[in-house]
Amino acid sequence: MKYKLFIFLLGCSPFLLGRIQDWLMMNLLGVPLLFLSVLMLLFWGYLSHLSLNLTNSDWKALILLNTPATIDLLLVLIQELGFGAYWMNRIGTYSQLFYLPLLPLGFRLTPWAHTVSPAYIAAFLCMIACSLFVYKKNG
């Protein structure tokens, strides 16, 4: 039971990483955003490997680790597509910060998009693909 909560909390780490990247972008010029996206995927791969070692089940690890990403994706899509604006509170702010490290990659994968939603979805799919790659490689 404890490992389930631990893996779920590991899945929440992009909130902190997004906040750190937000601070870097506000205080430093020339932050290499695409490089940070690649680092985030490498970190997510490490978390995927760690979660697999704790559960010994690909699907259980995938679900536990990516549940926060799924919930956050739903939150940002509801805000953008449903309400047409992001909430002006901590939930609205932190739901955007979760995917901030991967948004540069998401935008590169969706150059045709005129809204942020496809970039969020692409970022989410990159996280899932990264986890699946690690599970197949180690499984």
What spans do the regions from the language model cover?
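Hydrophobic alpha-helical membrane-insertion segments
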Residues: 63-88
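Hydrophobic alpha-helical transmembrane segments
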Residues: 102-127
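Canonical alpha-helical transmembrane segments
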Residues: 36-64
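Membrane-interface capping segments at transmembrane-helix boundaries
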Residues: 50-53, 132-139
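Membrane-helix interface and helix-disruption motif detector
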Residues: 22-33, 56-57, 83-89, 111-116
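Transmembrane alpha-helical insertion/packing segments
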Residues: 1-44
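Short hydrophobic, aromatic-rich alpha-helical segments embedded in or entering the lipid bilayer
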Residues: 89-107
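Hydrophobic cores of alpha-helical transmembrane segments in multi-pass inner/ER membrane proteins
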Residues: 38-47, 119-132
